Amino acid sequence: MTESPKRIVVGLSGGVDSAVAALRLVRAGHEVIGLFMKNWEDDDTLTQCSAEDDIAAAVAVAEHLGIPIRRVNFAAHYRREVFEHALQELRAGRTPNPDILCNRHVKFDRFLRHAREQFEADAVATGHYARTGRAGDGEPALLRGIDPSKDQSYFLAGVPRQALDAVRFPLGDSTKETVRAEARSAALPNFDRPDSTGICFIGERDFTQFMQRYIDPHPGPILTEDGREIGRHCGLAFYTLGQRRGLGIGGDRNRDSSAPWYVAGKDARRNALFVVQGHDHPWLQSAAVSTEPFHWLAPVPAEGARLHAQVRYRQEPQAGQLSHAEGGRVVFRFDEPQRAATPGQHLVLYDREQCLGGGVIDTAHPADRSAPPALQTQSTEVV
């Protein structure tokens, strides 16, 4: 069904996706206003894609489409509601997902309120590859984008459910190739601009070097599974479960295997980083995960519900069983052990194409009971 014309504020980032989202809304007859959100104050000249370049691209798109464009600075909100939380998580030895927090607190809270208050907008739109629909209770539902390689519903699992009625995702029914072709056909001035990569406030910069501006290095031992020290780390905050690159350790002359090393866990008491050899080492496998209070975007499923889950973006959905715990927490037991399920990241649940919501992983329960109980990133608690 074609939607009647509405006043829609589009978040124009300067990228191709948001540009095509605006293009489609204009062609559908809506009154479209572009809004460029500045969410990070540049503090150096190292970024390959500076805010000035992004603004220039967004303005060029708006002029090409004949729509007005405004700017808003949410940097203070972003720092308080996203970045400071990320720092707190990193200092605790966990691995946060700032993009999920940004969508929850900035893009689909601050942005939506700003659009309503300043422009009396009926809705906001972004270039996310996701869709909306109706759940069984008649309330709004978040659905996967049809392109599995670009589906971004994982990053939207923390969005306030009540906001979904006022959100439009014009690209949800498209593939990236279709969007690129449409941008080229419409002669959008940024049709060949590369996709952005990296964490939103870091961009293409080295993660460890950037974060050392805010978190003091705290060196400690790198230990093997049998407790031998084979190197030194610069601080537990700068490593994540399953990480291979940047460890500064090569082969071990005292072992038969030349397999690469991976981070398997952290012992905060000893300030020790544990590593193992082999991509699929048993210490990297989790039988289940527990979360902090879960954020539901749908009616709460029954105890024992069979669902699918992701513990990272672009992961193949994994089957398992849901259990409810005290305080709105959940436990999800996987049918097959999952590699590098990481505290601080999000468990996102799905019922077929519907995203049911997400929760921050606080414990990954190892499939291998021989993993040391002291490791901060995993628990040997029976689930």
Curated annotation (Swiss-Prot):
Q: Could you tell me which cysteines form disulfide bridges?
A: C102-C200
EC numbers on record:
2.8.1.13
From the UniProt entry, list the residue stretches annotated as the region Interaction with target base in tRNA.
97-99
Annotated site (Interaction with tRNA): H128, Q345
* Main location (coarse class): cytoplasm
Q: Which reaction does it catalyse?
A: S-sulfanyl-L-cysteinyl-[protein] + uridine(34) in tRNA + AH2 + ATP = 2-thiouridine(34) in tRNA + L-cysteinyl-[protein] + A + AMP + diphosphate + H(+)
Kindly report, in one word, the top-level EC class recorded for this enzyme. transferase
Q: What is this protein called?
A: tRNA-specific 2-thiouridylase MnmA
- Organism in which the protein naturally occurs: Halorhodospira halophila (strain DSM 244 / SL1) (Ectothiorhodospira halophila (strain DSM 244 / SL1))
